[in-house]
């Protein structure tokens, strides 16, 4: 079973590419963000350690229902490399373990011809080491900025902060096997053709 790592900068449209692949091809879509989010919910494998490590650093880490306030946590670690590294050390191993488990199960079931692991932190988390190939989703910076503002409701300041903290595009291109163009003018039909060509190589 082919394992594809799907990565790209914030706002590049990774989820769109993965959803098209899952809808029209024999591809299982795994989102590392969704796994990490679920694991940080109450009762999740990462919840207790995240609360223990970060609750004393901000008053609003927990929502009224006891769930982790992801916005507050993001603000806390965004501009502090030490805290970000601490958070990654908690969450990344658990996410990788679950991805490996899913892949092992699907390899036995033999339903899908490929697994597409969508993640923004492919190299940082070491997920690239489990992949047969890496696809980089590319969109112009202006397009990514527009998507974050229009689709996610980010302020201009927040958008600039996120884009500033991204890995350089040249690094993505250098380390990826294939580039998936996903600018504003790319339609679902266009994406089907792109994915089909890459899967049939």
Annotate each PLM feature.
Residues 6:
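Hydrophobic anchor at the beta1->P-loop junction of P-loop NTPases
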Residues 9:
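P-loop (Walker A) phosphate-binding loop of NTP-binding proteins
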Residues 12:
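ATP-binding Walker
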Residues 27-40:
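Short beta-strand-centered segment that lines the nucleotide-binding/catalytic pocket of NTP-utilizing
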Residues 37-111:
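ATP-dependent small-molecule kinase phosphotransfer cores
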Residues 101-114, 128-137, 141-154, 164, ...:
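NTP-dependent small-molecule kinase module
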């Amino acid at each position: 079973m082919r394992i594809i790592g799907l990565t790209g900068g914030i706002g590049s449209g990774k989820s769109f590419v993965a959803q098209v692949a899952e809808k029209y091809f024999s591809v299982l879509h795994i989102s590392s963000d969704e796994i990490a989010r679920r694991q940080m919910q109450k009762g999740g494998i990462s919840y207790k350690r995240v609360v223990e490590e970060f609750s004393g650093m901000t008053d609003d880490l927990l929502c009224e229902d006891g769930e982790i306030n992801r916005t507050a946590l993001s603000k806390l670690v965004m501009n502090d490399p030490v805290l970000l590294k601490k958070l990654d050390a908690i969450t990344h191993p658990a996410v990788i373990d679950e991805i490996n488990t899913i892949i092992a199960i699907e390899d036995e079931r033999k339903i899908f011809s490929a697994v597409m692991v969508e993640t923004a932190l492919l190299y940082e988390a070491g997920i690239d080491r489990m992949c047969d190939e890496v696809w980089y989703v590319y969109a112009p910076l202006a397009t990514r900025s527009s998507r974050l503002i229009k689709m996610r409701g980010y302020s201009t300041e927040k958008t600039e902060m996120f884009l500033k903290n991204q890995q350089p595009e040249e690094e993505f291109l250098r380390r990826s096997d294939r580039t998936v163009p996903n600018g504003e003018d790319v339609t679902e039909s266009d994406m089907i053709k792109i994915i089909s060509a890459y899967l049939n190589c």
